[in-house]
Amino acid sequence: MLSGKTVLLGVTGGIAAYKAAALASVLVKQHCHVEVILTEHATQFITPLTFEQLTGNRAMVDTFDRNFSHQVEHIALARRTDLVLVAPATANVCAKLAHGLADDMLTTTILACRCPKLIAPAMNTGMFENPVTQDNLDLLRKYGWEVIAPASGRLACGDVGAGKLPEPDILLQYVLRRLALPHDLEGRRVLVTAGPTQEPLDPVRYLTNHSSGKMGYAIARMAMLRGAKVTLISGPTALTPPPFVEVVPVVSAQDMFEAVAARQEQADFIFKAAAVADYTPADYSDNKMKKKDGDLSIPLKRTQDILQHLGSHRRPGQVICGFSMETQNMLENSQAKLVKKNVDMICANNLKVAGAGFGVDTNVITLITPQGAEELPLLSKEEAANRILDAAMALADR
C-alpha cells in the first residue's frame, strides 16, 4: 500500500534501536522506499550495514559525506521524503527537534522536511515522565508532529512503566494511516455496522447467522485510511478491530439498534453491513431449556428494522448504504429494498456466487442506486470497500 512513497526513518541511540531494523523490513514489504539516518550514538547499538541490507539504500550518519553528489545531501533527501518517522527517539533527540537544533545529519534533514512527521519516544520511565520531556513533546505537537505513545512494560533498565517502543507492526499502522491512501474523507464522520447478532434463547443457546464481519471491518479500515473519523458498531466476531477506529461492541439486534440510533445524527456516511437478526425469541428462559420428548416450537418476534429507522430519520446530506445478501432475485429484491428503506445505495451480493459467500476474503457486489446498478468484478473485500466508499462519495457530491 506504500508503493511510490518515501519514508525517512530516523534511528537514535537507545536499546530499542534494534526494533528499527524490523520496522524498516515491514515498510519495505509494503513496497515503501526507506531512507535511514542514524545518529552517531545509534551506531553503538546497531550498524548502518544492517539497514543497508534491509532497504537496499545507503544508511547515513555523517552530515558531510565526502562522496556527495552535486546536490546538498540533506536538502535533497528532505525534498523527496513523504513522511518522517523517528523511532526510537531518545529524550535528547526529542529536545533537539523541539527546539530546532540541527547539529547532525538527522536533525539537519528533518529541519528541512515539509512533510508529515511522526516520533516514537522510547526511554526510561522516569525520563519519559519528566516534565521537561513532556514539555518538549507538547512543543513537538504544537509544531505539527504526531507523537506516538510508548508502550508500557518491563524496560531494559529493569523499571516497569511507560517507555517501550511499540512493536513494528503497530508503528506501521501509523505510517499507513498517513500515506496509504489519499485523505479524501478528511473531516467526515463514518458509521459502520458489522458482524452478526446473537439472540439468546437461554443462558446457553442463541440464534445467530454465518456473518464473519469481514466486509464491514474492511469498510471501516479503508474509511480510516482515507482520513475519516470512523465508528464501528460490531456484533460478536473473531476479527481484530482496525486501528484508529472507535469500536462499539454489541451482542443482540436490540443492542445494535440502540447503538446505531444514538450515533446516527453525527454521521455523514452510514454503512449498515451487519447481518442483524430479523427475529428474536419472544421469551427468554433464565435457566437452561431441558431436552424433552417430542418436537419443540420456539415463538419468535420481529426485531426493530435498523435500516428502516435510518432511512426515516435521516438528516439532510447524510448518505446511507444498506447491504443485501440474496439467494434468488437479487436485483429485484435489492431495488425494492432501496425504495422501501429510503436509502441511497444497496450493496447486493448473491450467496450462491463463488467468492461472495460468508467468511471469505473476497466479494462480488452489485451497487444499486436510484440511477441504476453497477456490477463489480470479484474483488478482495478491501478493494470492494474502496469501491463502495467511492460510490458513496459520488452520491454525496450530487
Positions of predicted regions on the chain:
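A cross-family phosphate/adenosyl-ligand binding-site feature
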Residues: 1-119, 124-398
